A protein has these predicted regions:
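Long, charged, low-complexity, helical-prone intrinsically disordered regions
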Residues: 1-376
């Protein structure tokens, strides 16, 4: 588990739970069925990983903490937080310090645990929405600011609410004692890790892995090429120049995996299409009538090809894995339905679901249903 997180560098977290949370699913794709407590323990009592902003909210190897201190320092003074700081200190003098003090005395705390979460009345335009309810709290926003600025750290979650505690109670002392690299050095290390994780990639794909700006990525890539830590590369059929990590090796892939929409393999959709000829369609935030494939669609990797996609949902009330749609790619191999059925069985077992139900939607559904019913 620790090695898998270290190799990926960033395991994205997301609130969507129609099947299982994204970070658990990303590790299932690589490790197969595993006790989810192992990932929780990695960021919990074992203190071998931590949560911060990598590629969006992410689980990161603990050794990355020094590499992200520049991001924390910038967040502390970032203009995007200036309005909130000015308003809350104007309306509630000392509130930020009081929140930090309460966490020190009573942490770890979620925002709902605060003695005064300082809820705000929502603007009328959001009256019918539940999406922004939590942001109607100065307490929640204060905790998020202190987290972004590196003054608090995440200590697990309560439901899906982040719990906050003092940095020194979350990050091991030996990690806090590590020297803080310059922003340039830290960014070079992040770029190098992204390049190693991707194998061969364009500048945009590398920068997107840890959400670096285009200008920063351009400078760090140039420096790494000049030092010989990265190699410039040309890939047949690619319009843009690429970069290759010297340690990259051509490997033989014999994978069989369902991929979370938030998997690092799918971070950059143009890259997915260039590598696999597969247009990843991310439709979570598309209106239902406009969706082509479904709400929570997982590409299916077989060997070194993305050969199908399935729209999945875990019906926990009936303990059923619902395949709401199944769609094959043009070059679908004949073995794909049986291989996909086997992967769905592994997924259902891991999620403690008793049965699999395949709906009619999608060209692959009849063959997949037959394969699911034809248990070995």
């Amino acid at each position: 588990m620790r090695a898998a997180v270290a190799e990926l560098g960033a395991v994205q977290i997301d609130a969507v739970n129609v099947l299982v949370r994204a970070h658990y699913l990303t590790l299932f794709s690589r490790l197969g069925p595993y006790p989810v407590r192992l990932l929780d323990e990695l960021t919990g009592r074992r203190r071998q990983a931590f949560e911060y902003w990598g590629h969006a909210a992410s689980i990161l190897p603990m050794q990355f903490h020094p590499l992200l201190r520049w991001r924390m320092a910038r967040a502390a003074e970032d203009k995007s937080w200036a309005g909130f700081r000015a308003r809350v200190e104007g309306q509630r003098p000392g509130y930020l310090a009081a929140v930090e003090r309460e966490v020190a005395e009573r942490g770890p705390l979620a925002f709902t645990d605060l003695a005064d979460p300082a809820r705000r009345e929502r603007p009328a335009r959001y009256a019918a929405s539940t999406m922004l309810w939590d942001r109607g709290s100065d307490g929640k926003t204060a905790l998020e600011y202190l987290f972004d600025a590196g003054r608090l750290a995440a200590d697990g979650r309560k439901g899906f609410q982040r719990r906050y505690d003092l940095v020194e109670r979350v990050i091991p002392p030996e990690v806090l004692a590590l020297p803080t690299p310059s922003p340039d050095d830290a960014q070079r290390a992040l770029v190098l890790h992204a390049a190693r994780a991707l194998g061969v990639a364009t500048a945009n794909e590398i920068r997107y892995y840890f959400y670096l700006s285009a200008a920063v990525a351009k400078d760090r890539l140039r420096e790494l090429v000049e030092s010989g830590d990265l190699l410039p590369a040309r890939v047949e059929g690619w319009d843009e120049p690429a970069y290759l990590h010297p340690g990259a090796r051509r490997g033989q892939v014999s994978a069989r995996a369902l991929l979370s929409p938030f998997d690092s393999l799918l971070f950059e959709r143009d890259r997915v299409e260039r590598l696999f000829g597969f247009r990843h369609s991310f439709e979570l935030y598309v209106k239902p009538a406009q969706r082509r494939y479904g709400y929570f669609v997982l590409p299916f990797l077989l060997g070194d090809s993305l050969v199908a996609r399935v729209d999945l949902k875990a019906d926990r009330a009936t303990r059923t894995l619902l395949v709401l749609g199944a769609f094959g790619e043009p070059a679908l191999p004949g073995s794909a339905p049986a291989e996909l059925a086997a992967e769905l069985r592994d997924l259902a077992t891991w999620l403690e679901l008793d049965s699999i139900e395949v709906a009619d939607r999608g060209d692959l559904s009849p063959a997949l249903r037959s394969a699911v019913d034809d248990r070995p």
